[in-house]
Amino acid sequence: MCEEEDSTALVCDNGSGLCKAGFAGDDAPRAVFPSIVGRPRHQGVMVGMGQKDSYVGDEAQSKRGILTLKYPIEHGIITNWDDMEKIWHHSFYNELRVAPEEHPTLLTEAPLNPKANREKMTQIMFETFNVPAMYVAIQAVLSLYASGRTTGIVLDSGDGVTHNVPIYEGYALPHAIMRLDLAGRDLTDYLMKILSERGYSFVTTAEREIVRDIKEKLCYVALDFENEMATAASSSSLEKSYELPDGQVITIGNERFRCPETLFQPSFIGMESAGIHETTYNSIMKCDIDIRKDLYANNVLSGGTTMYPGIADRMQKEITALAPSTMKIKIIAPPERKYSVWIGGSILASLSTFQQMWISKQEYDEAGPSIVHRKCF
């Protein structure tokens, strides 16, 4: 550890799929690992193997064949606190190799996170990890900071949940936030399903990770879905092959764009919901008429599920069709948007003006976990 990292703030973005952790002031997270805790499915027979009763992150991923994998964060909200504690412990001690009691820690949360959840996060940080200070920031707001704006509407879509969050002069407008429980994990499940129609069977939690890799490497968003379907039916120009870990090669065609099309047509997976273009529009329409123009001109994409090639052009097309014809519409898709929440956290925690915003251990001891609602908004 170098000297100047004595009390640098830590930034930990806990996503449903990946945990991003690092030091404030850095331009990228030091550690990015899957938010998974794995427990052995079988009885250990070899003595002295040093088998553990649980594995976290990449280690769980590499031993996935013998483990049952569980995600403690579902739809952006922490549901299993014991496992979540393991993930935080892993990020501090194994990944960043720091003592949390020496560093102020910035955590992130989903918009519209239940109040009890924030309190529990605060409690664990101060009581289990003894941090000197902490803060909880809303993910979408951090993404907007990272893009260098204070006004705009963020479409934040990760592994567990998708949100539209309109932000004006740095304040999220809670009445207009839209939440859609459809994100990367659902797309992976849907791809598993449509691949099985092709005769490829993927069932276990370990095989799901293979399908996730296929999705990340080969899927894209069609500009015009019907046209693309016709092209796929009449020629093999859209087909790609993928080699499985055992050497078997599979071919995938229209599944490449049918999978992410679900974002625009949730009925594909039986959801009665508007697509991401409509939720964006609805969110803007819930805002004051005077600020809509600024929101239309600043549509910021954020999160891993916005990484599909073609998604920005498609959003531009769909929102243009919904909005008033004279409106200027701009979709901003920063290349580093996979980590823009973390980057925004890194920027925020290193601002001199932010230093008075931290919740200190002393304030926590005086007021208890509910202090988080007064200090973080």
Swiss-Prot record:
Coiled coil: none annotated. Pfam families: Actin (PF00022). Keywords: Acetylation, ATP-binding, Cytoplasm, Cytoskeleton, Hydrolase, Methylation, Muscle protein, Nucleotide-binding, Oxidation. Its EC number is 3.6.4.-. This is Actin, aortic smooth muscle. One of its GO terms (cellular component) is cytoplasm. It catalyses: ATP + H2O = ADP + phosphate + H(+). It comes from Gallus gallus. The modification Tele-methylhistidine is found at residue 75. Belongs to the actin family. Gene3D superfamilies: 3.30.420.40, Actin, Chain A, domain 4. PANTHER family: ACTIN (PTHR11937). The modification Methionine (R)-sulfoxide is found at residues 46, 49. Actins are highly conserved proteins that are involved in various types of cell motility and are ubiquitously expressed in all eukaryotic cells. GO terms for biological process: mesenchyme migration; positive regulation of gene expression. One of its GO terms (molecular function) is ATP binding. The modification N-acetylglutamate is found at residue 3. It comes from the Eukaryota. In vertebrates 3 main groups of actin isoforms, alpha, beta and gamma have been identified. The alpha actins are found in muscle tissues and are a major constituent of the contractile apparatus. The beta and gamma actins coexist in most cell types as components of the cytoskeleton and as mediators of internal cell motility. The gene is ACTA2. Polymerization of globular actin (G-actin) leads to a structural filament (F-actin) in the form of a two-stranded helix. Each actin can bind to 4 others.
